[in-house]
């Protein structure tokens, strides 16, 4: 893996999809163990402005595809107390514009789960010429997920690794 770089991105519409994008999350369970899971990303688009900075980002995550390595836990997460995938199986993310930082960008945005919106700020840095890593922390209660803290901690750490497809030259 090459050293992180904050060089400007090529202006235009960058894309990523299920084969080039990974979203992972971490939360503590009742025994204070860290539970790690993944959510498939259906699609993502990054609109980059003429200054090489992301102006708009949109992504759709497939909640039905949640995978923590535990069939029972995954079933619970898909249920009404957590993601309620029968109601809507998609978690939407919209953000922008990005703010340049010495390490990359700060990307203020919003998650939308069943119409409940939650602000989230991603710290983004490049990990290669067309790849990025974004991290954020959020409180699951801000998305309306209200289960006892004895079951799962309220703070969730999210990491997204993306190999972006640049716009045509």
Predicted feature locations:
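Low-complexity, acidic/polar, glycine-enriched regions of mature
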Residues: 1-169
